[in-house]
């Protein structure tokens, strides 16, 4: 019997490309309906796609496997984006009103739009995490409706090299797989594993991958910092091989003794 009520997602990493399809139950839990993966170590390094043709082939294979398990076609997939060069950059935009007035939604929208125009050389803004707004030296989480004459919007822009997103989109286009939406992988992970109390009280989430380690910091339910370090599990394996050990044995030793 064909499965019709589902959502599909694909995440690309240095070691593998994973695809999953599932549905949300009435109690809020997620039921996994299909799963597939392909090795990506030969064409994705530090989370960055270096061979679009091979990536497209892997995406096609994963999509076909998911469709076979679902006995249905997949129209669109949600895609997690991460990898080296992904990081956060702070920015502030200020406005001064002619006289004290009420901060409107239109003014806030205009400040948000101006933030997106900040020059970033070869980087592009993938998403924005608004921090706070300062109105006449008083911090406000929601400035709309507050009286004041001077407003500063503080933003945390999530940026990456333009090629990171471009190569990913080219790979999906070549595989003829339509992207429903691009999700920042570390943020999606944080939303899945961190509790509201942890995000509010303040915590750091460290995701240790094959070629990279991603650090995300939260405070007051807001992302405060994100960075991807070009070091991962494979780095440890390579260090062990320097002791005149084969890579396969080094990997086994690492996994066995941590």
Predicted regions and their residues:
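Nucleotide/phosphate-binding catalytic cleft detector across ATP-hydrolyzing
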Residues: 1-16, 20-204, 222-224, 233, ...
């Amino acid at each position: 019997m064909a499965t019709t009520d589902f959502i599909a997602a694909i995440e690309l990493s240095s070691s593998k490309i994973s695809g999953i399809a599932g549905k949300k139950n009435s109690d809020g839990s997620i039921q996994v309906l299909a799963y597939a993966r392909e090795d990506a170590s030969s064409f994705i390094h530090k989370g960055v796609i270096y061979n679009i043709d091979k990536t497209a082939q892997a995406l096609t294979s994963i999509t076909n496997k998911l469709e076979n398990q679902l006995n249905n076609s997949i129209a669109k997939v949600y895609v997690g984006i991460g990898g080296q060069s992904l990081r956060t950059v702070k920015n502030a935009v200020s406005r001064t009103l002619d006289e004290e007035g009420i901060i409107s939604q239109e003014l806030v929208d205009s400040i948000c739009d101006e933030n997106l125009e900040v020059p970033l050389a070869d980087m592009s803004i993938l998403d924005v995490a608004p921090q706070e707004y300062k109105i006449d030296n008083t911090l406000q989480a929601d400035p709309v409706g507050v009286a004041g004459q001077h407003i500063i919007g503080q933003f945390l822009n999530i940026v990456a090299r333009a090629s990171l997103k471009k190569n990913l989109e080219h790979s999906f286009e070549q595989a003829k797989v339509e992207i429903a939406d691009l999700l920042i992988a570390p943020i999606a992970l944080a939303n899945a594993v961190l509790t509201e109390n942890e995000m509010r009280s303040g915590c750091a989430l460290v995701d240790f991958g094959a070629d990279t380690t991603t650090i995300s910091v939260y405070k007051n339910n807001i992302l405060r910092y994100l960075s991807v370090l070009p070091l991962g599990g494979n780095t440890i394996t390579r260090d062990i091989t320097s002791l005149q050990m084969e890579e396969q044995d080094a990997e086994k030793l690492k996994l066995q003794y941590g």
